[in-house]
Structures are given as C-alpha cells and as structure tokens.
C-alpha cells in the first residue's frame, strides 16, 4: 500500500507539473502574440507601451484584456463598408477648391485632404450657434420643416426637459410621413434613467444604439463610443458641433449656469460628407444601408451658393485616432497671427505642446481659455500640471467663468 500511495503521489505531482507547464506555455505564447500585435498595430507608442507592461506583469490577464479591449473591430467593420461602398460624389460636380489659397493655407488644405480622404468643398454656408439657446430652436425648426427625412445622431439624448421636446417634435415629423432615424450611443443610454431611447421607440421612431456592450459579440467594444452630434434634414440641411441633447445646455431660467458650446448650421455640398458619416455609423449599428432615396426622395435637395470652403473630418472609433491631431497641429503651424483655443478640458499631448510653444516663439499670439472651475476637478488638476510647459514659451492662459466651451480658432491672415 505504501508503494502504491507513493506512486500515486508521484503521478499527481507529475500531473500537476505538466498542467503548470501547459498553463505557463499558453501564457508565454499569448503574451508573445499580444505583444507582437500591439507593437505592429498600435499607432500611439504610449498605448503600446502600456499594453506591453500589462502583458509582462500579468501575461494571461493582460492578453485577455487586450483581446477584449485593445483591438478596434469597429474600424474593421467600417473599412469593409467603405470598400463595398466607395465615397459617393458630392452634391454637385466640383473642381479643386483650394487653388487660390495663400501658400500656407494651401499646404494645410492638402494636409486635410490627405489625412481625411475628403475634398475641400466650396459653396457652403456655415452659421455658428452659441449655446443651446441658439442651437436648439434652430434644430427644432429644421425638424418641423422636414419634408422627407431626418437623421439624428447624439452621444447623449436625454428624454426629459429639452430632450422631451425633441422627442415630441420628431414624433410629429414621423406622423407627417417623414422618415426618421435616430442613433444614440449605448453607454449613456444604459447608465442614465432619463435617456430618450424608450420614448422614441414608443412613438415608432427607428432608433438604434451604437455598439451596445451587453451583446456578447460586442463586449470587446465596451470602450469604443460614438461622440458624434449630427442632425441632417432632407439630405441638405445639417447641424453639427459640440452639443448633445442635454439639459446642461438648456437653462433659460439661469443662462449663466448653462454649458456654452458651439454648434454649426451647415448647408451646401459638405452636408454630403456628413451624410456619409451617418450612413457608416448607422450601418455599423443596424447593418442597414441608406441609399440616396432616404435622404432626398425623388425631388432631390437644393444646393446653396454659400461662400465658405468646408470639409468634414471624422474622428471616432472607426477612424484613425491621429487624424484630428494632425489637422490640429497643422493648423497651429499654419497660423501667422493668432491661435485661440477655448476648451473645458485642456490636456495636450507632447506634439501639441511643442506646436503651441513653437507658434508662440515665432511671434504668433497663442491664447488658451479654460474655465475657472471645471465640472471635472480631477481633469482640471491634471490640466494645470501642463501649464508651465507652454507658459515658459510665451503662451497666454486665461481662466474665465464659463463652464463648458470648445472652440479652437486659428487666425492666419
């Protein structure tokens, strides 16, 4: 019996050792595969470094987290749609728009075209709308005047207050026979008890949630959110900018406490680029393709004769994350007179800090305007840690009383 017991113990130890070596081998292989993928595919060196450290410290756990959260599958789906449906021609047959620009602006225009893959289009009208008191009435009026289609995308769409008015107005448009499609990011809709998703569905409106992580197949996209704010009416009248459909932007009884952000009312050929962006987001959410008949029907839409050059530049989970950074740094480098940035959250990376400092050193007046009291104190503390890096080169930083405003402005002439 003692020999049998000893043999059994030896067998168990060997089995345990074999299992341990198997787990170790799997962890090593997973770590090598994860590290290789991160090095090859991560564009941001800081992101790649963080993932490498995570895999080195916790091989299996780090690899599993990378598999779930480190691979951008939304990008792959969008690329498949772009390959199947190449960019459509704009609303009119337009030639090159940047021919008569000064050299430094022509260079910026070429940069924008290269990184965005979209044409710089003439003939647009862009009307700035400051705050909800200006933007929301114009948006609601456009919805009331819709004859054929409404496409609305918002990261936050509250169902109370101003959001309830939007829901009612959209429902009235649908009752008139207007085709209405609404896209809301799933994250806020799931975290908030006041989202508009349920109310929109009760009115029979076609509404989709972007990238719901509760679906097992989309668990990997928990961190991939859609922050776009788009309203496109009848295919030719658009609104876009920084405002969600959110109560903090609408405080008629206490306007001084309202978030002050910028929205644009846009008409002209560039609305076609806004349409393509919504089409891709809608396809990613519902796998439904929107054709030209959805936007304008048989009658088509008018093309305005505005005087603004415009280009739609996308930034989101299905796009290259460096795109807006390249445009932003290119605009700072093209500035000749003044750069003014108004932002609630000033957390620049090192290339942006270098561009701002270089602009100030070559004589451009650089102003950063931030809120005196941020709605996110921790972000404000982190922001202040960067101030010295640009102040020492002559950049001016002003703290004002507003709560929330995003408005970069570049003066070149």
Name these PLM-found stretches.
Residues 352, 358-359, 374-375, 379, ...:
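Structured cytosolic domains appended to multi-pass membrane proteins
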Residues 1-11, 404-413:
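Single conserved hydrophobic/aromatic residue that forms the stacking wall/gate
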Residues 345-364:
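Helical hairpin unit composed of two closely spaced alpha helices linked by a short loop
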Residues 378-405, 412:
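C-terminal structural cap/anchor segments
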Residues 150, 336-339, 365:
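Structured, soluble regulatory/oligomerization domains located on the cytosolic or IMS-facing side
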Residues 5-326, 330, 334, 358, ...:
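N-terminal localization/anchoring segments of enzymes in phospholipid and broader phosphate metabolism
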Residues 319, 344-347, 373-381, 397, ...:
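Short, contiguous acidic/charged loop-to-helix segments that flank catalytic cores in large enzymes
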């Amino acid at each position: 019996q003692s020999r049998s017991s000893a043999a059994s113990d030896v067998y168990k130890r060997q089995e345990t050792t074999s299992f341990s070596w198997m787990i170790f081998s799997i962890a090593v292989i997973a770590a090598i595969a994860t590290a290789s993928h991160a090095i090859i595919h991560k564009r941001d060196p800081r992101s790649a470094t963080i993932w490498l450290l995570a895999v080195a410290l916790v091989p299996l756990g780090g690899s599993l987290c990378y598999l779930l959260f480190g691979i951008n599958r939304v990008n792959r789906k969008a690329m498949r749609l772009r390959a199947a449906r190449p960019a459509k021609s704009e609303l009119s047959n337009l030639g090159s728009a940047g021919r008569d620009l000064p050299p430094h602006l022509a260079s910026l225009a070429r940069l924008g075209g290269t990184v965005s893959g979209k044409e710089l289009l003439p003939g647009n009208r862009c009307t700035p709308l400051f705050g909800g008191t200006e933007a929301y009435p114009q948006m609601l009026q456009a919805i009331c005047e819709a004859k054929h289609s409404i496409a609305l995308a918002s990261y936050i769409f509250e169902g109370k207050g101003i959001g309830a008015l939007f829901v009612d107005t959209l429902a009235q448009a649908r009752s008139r026979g207007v085709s209405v499609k609404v896209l809301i990011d799933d994250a806020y809709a799931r975290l908030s008890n006041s989202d508009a998703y349920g109310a929109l569905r009760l009115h029979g409106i076609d509404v989709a949630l972007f990238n719901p992580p509760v679906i097992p197949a989309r668990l990997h996209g928990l961190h991939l959110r859609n922050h776009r704010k788009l309203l496109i009416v009848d295919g030719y009248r658009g609104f876009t900018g920084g405002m969600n459909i959110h109560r903090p932007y609408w405080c008629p009884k206490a306007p001084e406490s309202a978030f002050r952000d910028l929205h644009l009312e846009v008409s002209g050929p560039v609305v076609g680029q806004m349409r393509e962006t919504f089409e891709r987001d809608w396809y990613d959410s519902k796998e439904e393709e929107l054709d030209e008949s959805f936007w304008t029907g048989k009658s088509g839409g008018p093309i305005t004769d505005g005087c603004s050059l415009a280009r739609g530049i996308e930034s989101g989970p299905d796009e290259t994350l460096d795109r807006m950074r390249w445009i932003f740094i290119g605009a700072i480098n093209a500035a000749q007179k003044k750069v003014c940035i108004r932002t609630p959250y000033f957390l620049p990376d090192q290339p942006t800090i270098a561009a701002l400092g270089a602009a100030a050193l070559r004589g451009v007046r650089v102003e950063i305007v931030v809120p005196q009291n941020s709605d996110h104190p921790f972000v404000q503390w982190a922001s202040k840690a960067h101030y010295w890096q640009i102040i020492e080169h002559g950049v001016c930083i002003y703290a004002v009383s507003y709560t929330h405003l995003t408005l970069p402005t570049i003066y070149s002439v």
